[in-house]
Amino acid sequence: MYRMQLLSCIALSLALVTNSAPTSSSTKKTQLQLEHLLLDLQMILNGINNYKNPKLTRMLTFKFYMPKKATELKHLQCLEEELRPLEEVLNLAQSKNFHLRDTKDLISNINVIVLELKGSETTLMCEYADETATIVEFLNRWITFCQSIISTLT
Protein backbone atom coordinates (compact mmCIF):
# COMPACT_ATOMS: atom_id res chain seq x y z
CA MET A 1 0.00 0.00 0.00
CA TYR A 2 2.67 2.51 1.03
CA ARG A 3 4.97 1.26 -1.69
CA MET A 4 2.53 2.39 -4.40
CA GLN A 5 2.20 5.85 -2.83
CA LEU A 6 5.97 6.15 -2.54
CA LEU A 7 6.47 5.16 -6.18
CA SER A 8 3.79 7.63 -7.27
CA CYS A 9 5.45 10.36 -5.25
CA ILE A 10 8.85 9.60 -6.78
CA ALA A 11 7.41 9.53 -10.30
CA LEU A 12 5.67 12.88 -9.80
CA SER A 13 8.82 14.40 -8.31
CA LEU A 14 10.91 13.25 -11.27
CA ALA A 15 8.35 14.61 -13.72
CA LEU A 16 8.34 17.95 -11.93
CA VAL A 17 12.12 18.18 -11.84
CA THR A 18 12.59 17.28 -15.50
CA ASN A 19 9.89 19.66 -16.73
CA SER A 20 11.12 22.65 -14.74
CA ALA A 21 14.86 22.19 -15.17
CA PRO A 22 16.37 24.30 -17.94
CA THR A 23 17.66 22.28 -20.84
CA SER A 24 20.76 23.00 -22.81
CA SER A 25 18.60 23.82 -25.84
CA SER A 26 16.64 26.44 -23.88
CA THR A 27 19.93 27.93 -22.65
CA LYS A 28 21.22 27.99 -26.23
CA LYS A 29 18.01 29.67 -27.42
CA THR A 30 18.29 32.28 -24.67
CA GLN A 31 21.90 32.91 -25.60
CA LEU A 32 21.01 33.36 -29.29
CA GLN A 33 18.19 35.76 -28.43
CA LEU A 34 20.51 37.78 -26.20
CA GLU A 35 23.10 37.89 -28.99
CA HIS A 36 20.45 39.23 -31.41
CA LEU A 37 19.38 41.82 -28.84
CA LEU A 38 23.01 42.78 -28.32
CA LEU A 39 23.56 43.22 -32.08
CA ASP A 40 20.44 45.38 -32.46
CA LEU A 41 21.49 47.63 -29.58
CA GLN A 42 25.03 47.89 -30.97
CA MET A 43 23.65 48.76 -34.41
CA ILE A 44 21.68 51.65 -32.94
CA LEU A 45 24.67 52.82 -30.91
CA ASN A 46 26.97 52.67 -33.95
CA GLY A 47 24.47 54.71 -35.96
CA ILE A 48 24.31 57.34 -33.22
CA ASN A 49 28.08 57.49 -32.75
CA ASN A 50 28.65 57.85 -36.48
CA TYR A 51 30.92 60.85 -36.98
CA LYS A 52 28.54 62.21 -39.65
CA ASN A 53 25.66 62.49 -37.18
CA PRO A 54 25.00 66.24 -36.90
CA LYS A 55 22.16 65.71 -34.42
CA LEU A 56 24.12 63.83 -31.77
CA THR A 57 24.31 66.82 -29.44
CA ARG A 58 20.55 67.23 -29.69
CA MET A 59 20.02 63.52 -29.05
CA LEU A 60 22.15 63.73 -25.91
CA THR A 61 19.69 66.18 -24.35
CA PHE A 62 17.02 63.48 -24.08
CA LYS A 63 17.19 61.45 -20.90
CA PHE A 64 16.32 57.80 -20.33
CA TYR A 65 15.52 55.96 -17.16
CA MET A 66 17.81 53.16 -16.04
CA PRO A 67 16.97 50.50 -13.48
CA LYS A 68 18.77 50.62 -10.15
CA LYS A 69 19.79 47.04 -10.70
CA ALA A 70 19.67 45.00 -13.90
CA THR A 71 21.08 41.54 -13.36
CA GLU A 72 18.37 39.12 -14.50
CA LEU A 73 16.28 38.61 -17.62
CA LYS A 74 13.18 39.86 -15.80
CA HIS A 75 14.85 43.29 -15.61
CA LEU A 76 14.39 43.56 -19.38
CA GLN A 77 10.95 44.89 -18.43
CA CYS A 78 12.74 48.19 -17.74
CA LEU A 79 14.22 48.22 -21.26
CA GLU A 80 10.81 47.45 -22.73
CA GLU A 81 9.33 50.47 -20.95
CA GLU A 82 11.92 52.78 -22.53
CA LEU A 83 11.60 51.49 -26.11
CA ARG A 84 8.94 54.01 -27.16
CA PRO A 85 10.97 57.04 -25.96
CA LEU A 86 14.04 55.52 -27.66
CA GLU A 87 12.19 55.19 -30.94
CA GLU A 88 10.91 58.77 -30.68
CA VAL A 89 14.41 60.15 -30.14
CA LEU A 90 15.78 58.11 -33.03
CA ASN A 91 13.00 59.36 -35.30
CA LEU A 92 13.65 62.98 -34.31
CA ALA A 93 17.30 62.60 -35.18
CA GLN A 94 16.72 61.28 -38.70
CA SER A 95 18.18 63.55 -41.35
CA LYS A 96 19.61 63.47 -44.83
CA ASN A 97 23.12 62.86 -43.45
CA PHE A 98 22.10 60.59 -40.59
CA HIS A 99 19.67 57.77 -41.15
CA LEU A 100 19.36 54.63 -39.10
CA ARG A 101 17.94 52.08 -41.45
CA ASP A 102 14.61 50.70 -40.39
CA THR A 103 14.43 52.28 -36.94
CA LYS A 104 10.90 50.98 -36.53
CA ASP A 105 12.01 47.43 -37.44
CA LEU A 106 14.96 47.56 -35.04
CA ILE A 107 12.75 48.69 -32.16
CA SER A 108 10.15 46.09 -33.08
CA ASN A 109 12.80 43.34 -33.14
CA ILE A 110 14.12 44.46 -29.77
CA ASN A 111 10.61 44.46 -28.34
CA VAL A 112 9.87 40.93 -29.58
CA ILE A 113 13.16 39.57 -28.23
CA VAL A 114 12.67 41.31 -24.87
CA LEU A 115 9.16 39.88 -24.54
CA GLU A 116 10.42 36.37 -25.28
CA LEU A 117 13.38 36.65 -22.90
CA LYS A 118 11.62 38.16 -19.91
CA GLY A 119 8.55 35.96 -20.30
CA SER A 120 4.95 37.05 -20.50
CA GLU A 121 4.28 36.44 -16.81
CA THR A 122 6.74 39.11 -15.73
CA THR A 123 4.98 41.94 -13.95
CA LEU A 124 8.08 43.49 -12.46
CA MET A 125 7.76 47.08 -11.34
CA CYS A 126 11.00 48.73 -12.40
CA GLU A 127 12.94 50.51 -9.71
CA TYR A 128 14.69 53.28 -11.55
CA ALA A 129 17.92 54.94 -10.51
CA ASP A 130 17.70 58.55 -9.39
CA GLU A 131 19.93 59.71 -12.23
CA THR A 132 18.85 59.54 -15.84
CA ALA A 133 21.09 58.52 -18.73
CA THR A 134 21.81 59.93 -22.17
CA ILE A 135 20.95 57.79 -25.16
CA VAL A 136 24.59 56.67 -25.45
CA GLU A 137 24.83 55.75 -21.75
CA PHE A 138 21.45 54.00 -21.96
CA LEU A 139 22.50 51.85 -24.91
CA ASN A 140 25.94 51.12 -23.42
CA ARG A 141 24.41 49.94 -20.14
CA TRP A 142 21.97 47.59 -21.87
CA ILE A 143 24.76 46.30 -24.12
CA THR A 144 26.81 45.57 -20.98
CA PHE A 145 23.77 43.87 -19.44
CA CYS A 146 23.44 41.55 -22.47
CA GLN A 147 27.15 40.76 -22.47
CA SER A 148 27.07 39.94 -18.77
CA ILE A 149 24.10 37.57 -19.08
CA ILE A 150 25.64 35.90 -22.14
CA SER A 151 28.88 35.33 -20.23
CA THR A 152 26.97 33.54 -17.45
CA LEU A 153 25.31 31.25 -20.00
CA THR A 154 28.54 30.12 -21.66
Curated annotation (Swiss-Prot):
Glycans are attached at T23. SUPFAM superfamilies: 4-helical cytokines. Residues 1-20 form the signal peptide. GO terms for biological process: adaptive immune response. The keyword Transmembrane does not apply. Its main location: secreted. Gene3D superfamilies: 1.20.1250.10. Keywords: Adaptive immunity, Cytokine, Disulfide bond, Glycoprotein, Growth factor, Immunity, Secreted, Signal. It is found in: Secreted. It comes from the Eukaryota. The keyword Calcium does not apply. GO terms for molecular function: cytokine activity; growth factor activity; interleukin-2 receptor binding. Disulfide bonds join C78-C126. One of its GO terms (cellular component) is extracellular space. InterPro entries: 4_helix_cytokine-like_core, IL-2, IL-2_CS. Cytokine produced by activated CD4-positive helper T-cells and to a lesser extend activated CD8-positive T-cells and natural killer (NK) cells that plays pivotal roles in the immune response and tolerance. Binds to a receptor complex composed of either the high-affinity trimeric IL-2R (IL2RA/CD25, IL2RB/CD122 and IL2RG/CD132) or the low-affinity dimeric IL-2R (IL2RB and IL2RG). Interaction with the receptor leads to oligomerization and conformation changes in the IL-2R subunits resulting in downstream signaling starting with phosphorylation of JAK1 and JAK3. Belongs to the IL-2 family. PANTHER family: INTERLEUKIN-2 (PTHR48487:SF1). This is Interleukin-2. It comes from Papio anubis (Olive baboon). The lineage of its organism: Eukaryota, Metazoa, Chordata, Craniata, Vertebrata.
